[in-house]
């Protein structure tokens, strides 16, 4: 979603000066270009402010989860029948997903504890890489239901919504 928005913004930003200069005299084009630049800066500041708010919210939500480490994940020390969330604060998709997860979980009064594995250092921490491989995690955010029979169910938002998925896994 963010990729589409960024592409659309890029196209608009690139084509706006062309259309403005084609429709006005040179002095008006200069004024329009200045206005366009100010608008771009304003939009950029709004995006930065939005990202800062999401980062703060991410940190607050993660505090309500049970933070875990890769060793506990690899050694099956997490209580089955709960959720395991792979993510990191620097991931824009994780920052967008986490408030939705928290809100949906609260709305459905899910009985699950949510374990959180911070994948920030996955590129240099082999244990985190192994934990991700164990559950076939290729990217974040990833949410997994740890079945009581030692299996697992991965949320795939291309196939089901988070509320639908909660309804499915609450039947296990």
Please describe what each predicted stretch is.
Residues 69-113:
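Local sequence-structure signature of Cys/Sec-based thiol-disulfide redox active-site neighborhoods
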Residues 18-22:
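C-terminal motif of bacterial Sec signal peptides marking the signal peptidase cleavage site
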Residues 64-68, 86, 110-127:
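Thiol-based oxidoreductase modules, predominantly thioredoxin-like and allied folds used
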Residues 138-172:
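Non-catalytic, surface beta->alpha helical segment in thiol-disulfide oxidoreductase systems
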Residues 24-81, 170-172:
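N-terminal leader/targeting and pre-domain segments
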Residues 93, 97-100, 128, 161, ...:
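Stable alpha-helical elements in mature extracytoplasmic
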Residues 1-10:
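Bacterial N-terminal signal peptides that target proteins for export
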Residues 89-93, 119-122, 150-152:
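Solvent-exposed loop/turn segments at secondary-structure junctions
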């Amino acid at each position: 979603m963010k990729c589409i928005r960024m592409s659309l913004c890029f196209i608009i930003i690139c084509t706006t000066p062309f259309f403005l200069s084609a429709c006005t005299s040179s002095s008006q084009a200069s004024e329009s270009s200045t206005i366009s630049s100010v608008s771009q800066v304003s939009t950029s500041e709004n995006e930065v402010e939005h990202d800062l708010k999401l980062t703060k919210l991410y940190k607050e939500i993660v505090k309500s989860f049970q933070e875990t480490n890769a060793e506990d994940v690899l050694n099956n020390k997490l209580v089955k029948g709960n959720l395991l969330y792979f993510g990191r604060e620097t991931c824009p998709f994780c920052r967008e997903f986490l408030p939705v997860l928290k809100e949906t979980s609260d709305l459905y009064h899910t009985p699950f504890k949510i374990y959180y594995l911070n994948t920030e250092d996955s590129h240099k921490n082999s244990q985190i890489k192994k934990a991700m491989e164990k559950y076939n995690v290729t990217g974040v955010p990833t949410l997994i239901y740890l079945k009581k029979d030692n299996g697992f169910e991965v949320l795939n938002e291309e196939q089901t919504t988070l509320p639908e998925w909660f309804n499915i896994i609450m039947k296990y």
